[in-house]
Amino acid sequence: MHCPYCNASETKVIDSRLAAEGAQVRRRRSCNSCQERFTTFEVVEVVMPRIIKSSGKIEPYDNDKLRRSILLPLQKRPITIDEQEGMISRIEKRVRQMGEREVSSKVLGEIIMSELKTLDDVAYVRFASVYRDFQDIDAFHQEIANIRPNEK
């Protein structure tokens, strides 16, 4: 690791600790040349599978696109940023755990819907209406009935 102050290549680790709930390693370093101290963070590089669109086109996974598609139905809902970020992390984890190099957008959409369903019914129906291309009010009624099958 090069020193950010003098660009020397010889540095030593003074302290290492887990950070971000174990997702990162925080290291305090000292430069052997100028004795300045600095902090680095080490994270695992995660490779997400490519997404196969319904048209057959293959695109790289896009975290921003996932985030936008989830945040839109969650607008004006009582969901905290931490809950939103947690859901995005769970979705990405489920996709990675599939162990595939390519995943269809249909599978990704179903994972998103299952996560939204457990988080917020209204956001789930909003997302489902676009994802499943609801054409009339009956489609909404049917989806709501599926959420609450025992209620009349």
From Swiss-Prot:
- Quick check: keyword Zinc-finger in the entry? yes
Needs which cofactor? Answer: Zn(2+)
- UniProt keyword Zinc, yes or no: yes
- What processes does the entry annotate via GO biological process terms? negative regulation of DNA-templated transcription
Q: Which domain of life is it from?
A: Bacteria
ATP-cone domain ranges (all copies):
49-139
Q: Where are the zinc fingers (unnamed)?
A: 3-34
* A single GO molecular function term of this UniProt record: DNA binding
Which controlled-vocabulary keywords does the entry list? ATP-binding, DNA-binding, Metal-binding, Nucleotide-binding, Repressor, Transcription, Transcription regulation, Zinc, Zinc-finger
The note on the cofactor says: Binds 1 zinc ion.
The UniProt function text for this chain reads: Negatively regulates transcription of bacterial ribonucleotide reductase nrd genes and operons by binding to NrdR-boxes.
Q: Which family does it belong to?
A: Belongs to the NrdR family.
What name does this protein carry?
Transcriptional repressor NrdR
- Report the gene name: nrdR
